[in-house]
Amino acid sequence: RPKLPHRHPEIIQNEQDSREKVLKERKFPSFALHTPREEYINELNRQRELLKEKQKDEHKEYLIEDPEQQESSSTSSSEEVVPINTEQKRIPREDMLYQHTLEQLRRLSKYNQLQLQAIYAQEQLIRMKENSQRKPMRVVNQEQAYFYLEPFQPSYQLDVYPYAAWFHPAQIMQHVAYSPFHDTAKLIASENSEKTDIIPEW
């Protein structure tokens, strides 16, 4: 391990000072110079305080000028209409902000009302569609009536078809001819049963 030569702190301090001098001579901007953080924060705080003082002074000057203008306007016998631009200049910043927020609130309420009206109109359209689907229109022509759907389509009546007819799909069953059911209480026999000796089948 090679040992680094011991450097005196005085020499290091002198080197830093010489660097700052060189940077200043070259006319670098102030942000390029190495400044500790605390100094930078203190500088920002000073600038902030100066700005606040300037604003307070402007406000005081405005308050002082305002009563003088009121007195001069009251002494004048003829009433003059003040233009809108001068009135707006007299309004302090807080009042301007207040008016701006009021205007934003009005716009927002207007926008919300328009949205509510649009939602209400959409709901009415949906209700009208539902009602028209529940009560289909009466159509004289049967071909036109085919296009209107009924809410409950009639189910297949099982007593009309033979046993297990419901098992087959409707498309197949429409081509098959069905014989109607016979009453089981009646005897199945030919008309000549009196003449022949055939026993009727149950």
Curated annotation (Swiss-Prot):
Keyword check for Transmembrane helix: no
Start-end of Basic and acidic residues biased regions: 16-25, 51-63
Stated family: Belongs to the alpha-casein family.
Organism: Equus asinus (Donkey)
UniProt miscellaneous comment: The sequence of variant A is shown.
Disordered, as annotated region: 1-25, 51-84
Range of residues in the leader sequence: none
The name this protein goes by in its record: Alpha-S1-casein
Tissue expression notes: Mammary gland specific. Secreted in milk.
Compartment(s) of residence: Secreted
InterPro entries with a match to the protein in the record: Alpha-s1_casein (IPR026999), Casein (IPR001588)
Keyword tRNA processing: no
Pfam assignment, any one: Casein
